[in-house]
C-alpha cells in the first residue's frame, strides 16, 4: 500500500517544489525513491505547512528527517489506497501576507467577494504552454488586518498556476485604487491573460491540504519545524526593523 506524508518546508531555500535541480522534490526522491504523487507544486519562494507526497515505502519519520536537508520536515503519515490521488483533495488552504501601506480594507473585501465563486480565471492564470481549463471555483477569500499586516486566506479544491498570487495582487490593487470593482468584474467576464502581475512568492504559504485520511502525527518533528520557523521569524522581524531604521536615517539627510 502507498503512504502519504505531510511535509513542511521553508520555500525560500528551494527553487520550487519540482522541475529544477534545486527544487525540493529531488531531495525527497533521495530519501523515498519514486514519488508517486504530490499535493501541490508550489512556486519558488513559497513555503508550506502541510504539503503532501505519496510514496511506495513506509519509513520512520525520524529516519526521513535525518536524511532531509535543512528547512524540510516530514511530520505525519497515513496509509492510503492504491487508487489514492493526492491532487484530489477536499480543499486547499493558502495564506498570502502583505504589509499594510494604507490600502482601503473595504475595497479589498469587496474585491475578494467578487473574485470568490466559480469563474473563468484566465486573467489570473499563467499558462505553462499546455491547454487547460481556466474555469475554477474559489470557495472562500477572506481578508483581514492584523496589526500592520494584511492576511488573505484562499480556500478551494485546486488552484491554477500563479492563480493565488495574481488574485492577491488584484485584491491589493483594489485597496490601492489601481483597480476598481468594475475592472475586476471585467477581468472575469472578458478575460485578458497576462494583464495581472503576480504578487511576490515569499508572501504565500500553503497552510493545509485536507483529505479524508487519518494521519499519524510525529509531534517531535512538528515541534522541530515550529522552533525553526519561530527562530527565523524573530530574525526577520529584527532585520526588517533594522532596514526601516536605515531608511528613516537616510531620510533625515534630505531635510
Curated annotation (Swiss-Prot):
The active site is at 43 (nucleophile). GO terms for biological process: tRNA pseudouridine synthesis. The keyword Oxidoreductase does not apply. Pfam families: PseudoU_synth_1. InterPro entries: PsdUridine_synth_cat_dom_sf, PsdUridine_synth_TruA, PsdUridine_synth_TruA_a/b_dom, PsdUridine_synth_TruA_C, TruA/RsuA/RluB/E/F_N. Its EC number is 5.4.99.12. Formation of pseudouridine at positions 38, 39 and 40 in the anticodon stem and loop of transfer RNAs. This is tRNA pseudouridine synthase A. It comes from Pyrobaculum islandicum (strain DSM 4184 / JCM 9189 / GEO3). The lineage of its organism: Archaea, Thermoproteota, Thermoprotei, Thermoproteales, Thermoproteaceae. The gene is truA.
Amino acid at each position: 500500500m502507498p503512504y502519504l506524508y505531510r511535509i513542511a518546508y521553508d520555500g525560500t531555500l528551494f527553487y520550487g517544489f519540482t522541475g529544477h535541480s534545486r527544487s525540493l522534490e529531488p531531495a525527497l526522491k533521495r530519501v523515498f525513491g519514486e514519488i508517486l504523487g504530490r499535493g501541490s507544486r508550489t512556486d519558488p519562494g513559497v513555503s508550506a505547512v502541510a504539503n503532501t507526497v505519496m510514496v511506495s515505502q513506509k519509513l520512520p519519520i525520524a529516519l526521513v528527517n535525518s536524511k532531509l536537508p535543512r528547512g524540510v520536515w516530514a511530520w505525519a503519515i497515513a496509509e492510503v489506497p492504491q487508487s489514492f490521488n493526492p491532487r484530489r483533495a477536499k480543499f486547499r488552504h493558502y495564506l498570502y501576507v502583505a504589509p499594510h501601506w494604507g490600502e482601503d480594507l473595504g475595497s479589498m473585501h469587496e474585491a475578494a467577494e467578487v473574485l470568490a465563486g466559480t469563474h473563468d480565471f484566465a486573467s489570473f492564470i499563467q499558462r505553462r504552454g499546455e491547454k487547460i481549463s481556466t474555469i475554477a471555483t474559489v470557495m472562500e477569500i477572506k481578508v483581514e488586518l492584523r496589526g500592520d499586516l494584511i492576511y488573505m486566506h484562499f480556500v478551494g479544491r485546486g488552484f491554477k498556476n500563479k492563480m493565488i498570487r495574481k488574485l492577491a495582487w488584484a485584491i491589493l490593487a483594489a485597496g490601492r485604487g489601481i483597480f476598481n470593482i468594475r475592472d475586476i468584474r471585467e477581468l472575469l467576464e472578458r478575460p485578458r491573460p497576462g494583464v495581472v502581475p503576480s504578487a511576490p512568492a515569499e508572501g504565500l504559504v500553503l497552510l493545509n491540504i485536507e483529505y479524508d485520511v487519518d494521519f499519524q502525527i510525529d509531534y517531535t518533528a512538528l515541534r522541530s519545524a515550529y522552533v525553526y520557523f519561530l527562530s527565523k521569524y524573530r530574525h526577520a522581524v529584527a532585520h526588517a526593523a533594522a532596514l526601516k531604521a536605515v531608511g528613516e536615517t537616510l531620510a533625515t539627510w534630505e531635510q
